[in-house]
UniProtKB/Swiss-Prot annotation:
GO terms for cellular component: ribonucleoprotein complex; ribosome. It holds the Pfam family Ribosomal_L5_C. Belongs to the universal ribosomal protein uL5 family. It comes from Frankia alni (strain DSM 45986 / CECT 9034 / ACN14a). GO terms for molecular function: rRNA binding; structural constituent of ribosome; tRNA binding. This is one of the proteins that bind and probably mediate the attachment of the 5S RNA into the large ribosomal subunit, where it forms part of the central protuberance. In the 70S ribosome it contacts protein S13 of the 30S subunit (bridge B1b), connecting the 2 subunits; this bridge is implicated in subunit movement. Contacts the P site tRNA; the 5S rRNA and some of its associated proteins might help stabilize positioning of ribosome-bound tRNAs. This is Large ribosomal subunit protein uL5.
């Protein structure tokens, strides 16, 4: 998944495979496709946010530990526990109760996660027909949901206490949805044709 490049200060440092491909092939293709005059106009990936909401944690606080453990295994980074901003009596929710976990990935970890997501995790989804090309937010950012955490190979299926879904947001520097779609398609995101 990584390619090694020579760096004077630290010696050999691995460069994520997808990042290498973006620099060498994808950026040039996008520049040609959208006829950018400046290299800074070429869209790139800024960060990936992985969010796991655990609404049942309001009744059982131990459930949040499983979500934190799963997210840490999937992303390789310690998740931030998200707490309720205000109390809602109908949901038996009090202000400050843990209700989810979130991880923001940047840099090499982000590229490695995207590579694993596209090449390993998404193909493991049962009856997968591709991602919807319409879930862009108008500014080139893409958000989609995954219904179960077992599609990631880091999760041991025998140790799953309950099935949890997650939201994955890919934030890009693209200014339009078409640019963002072209970038993610070039990175290997399997969008279905409508």
């Amino acid at each position: 998944m990584t390619v090694t490049t020579e760096d004077r200060t630290t010696g050999a440092r691995p460069v994520p495979r997808l990042k290498q491909r973006y620099r060498e092939e994808i950026a040039a293709t996008l520049r040609e496709e959208f006829s950018y005059r400046n290299v800074m106009q070429i869209p790139g990936v800024v960060k990936v946010v992985v969010n796991m909401g655990v609404g049942d944690a309001a009744r059982d606080a131990k459930l949040i530990d499983g979500a934190v453990r799963d997210l840490a295994a999937i992303t390789g980074q310690k998740p931030a526990v998200r707490r309720a901003k205000k109390s809602i009596a109908q949901f038996k929710l009090r202000e400050g109760m843990p209700i989810g976990a979130k991880v923001t990935l940047r840099g090499d970890r982000m590229w490695e996660f995207l590579d694993r997501l596209v090449s390993i995790a998404l193909p493991r989804i049962r009856d997968f027909r591709g991602l919807s090309p319409k879930q862009f937010d108008g500014a080139g950012n893409y958000t989609f949901g995954v219904t179960e955490q077992s599609i990631f190979h880091e999760i041991d299926i025998d140790r799953i206490d309950r099935v949890r879904g997650m939201d994955i947001t890919v934030v890009t520097t693209a200014t339009t949805d078409d640019e963002g779609r072209a970038l993610l398609r070039a990175l290997g995101f399997p969008f279905r044709e409508n």
